[in-house]
Amino acid sequence: MAPKKAKRRAGAEGSSNVFSMFDQTQIQEFKEAFTVIDQNRDGIIDKEDLRDTFAAMGRLNVKNEELDAMMKEASGPINFTVFLTMFGEKLKGADPEDVITGAFKVLDPEGKGTIKKQFLEELLTTQCDRFSQEEIKNMWAAFPPDVGGNVDYKNICYVITHGDAKDQE
């Protein structure tokens, strides 16, 4: 009986290890991100969930090879624990500015360094910790979009991690 207990405990530590890497707020934010990606709400992120997520971001022609490569990053089905583990491994030792910039880059498949104001505003007001209209107004005052309606997310990332706007050269 003792060996079973020890075995169970070791297994539990293995799965709880990933949860000890993040605080409760971070885990909740990852859970919200997981829920956004898990489009069919079955508790598993699959290829169709990824395709639907890209479509929701305006990227309609994602190649199967690209989706397959993403799915192969996991050793099996991507439930929340696997999702959290994958991010834990990627974020280990990462610079916070790089992490935040990387999150924005997902929304910028063309690598322009900008995203559409309308799209960002929709995300911020409809997903996860929703921004109020006052918060949106303050954001656009701090980070005004250009004449084409594009927002420079690299500057946003810099301010989030350093507190001051980067000098424009």
Curated annotation (Swiss-Prot):
Record Pfam families: EF-hand_6
Lineage of producing organism: Eukaryota, Metazoa, Chordata, Craniata, Vertebrata
Residues found modified as Phosphothreonine: 25, 35, 101
Stored InterPro entries: EF-hand-dom_pair, EF_Hand_1_Ca_BS, EF_hand_dom, Myosin_RLC
Binding site for Ca(2+): 38, 40, 42, 49
Knockout-associated phenotype: Deficient mice completely lack skeletal muscle and die immediately after birth because of respiratory failure.
Alphabetic keyword roster: Calcium, Metal-binding, Methylation, Motor protein, Muscle protein, Myosin, Phosphoprotein, Repeat
Modified residues (N,N,N-trimethylalanine): 2
A GO MF label: structural constituent of muscle
Protein name: Myosin regulatory light chain 11
More about this protein: This chain binds calcium.
Modification Phosphoserine occurs at: 15-16, 75
Keyword Metal-binding annotated: yes
GO BP term (any one): muscle contraction
SUPFAM superfamilies in UniProt: EF-hand
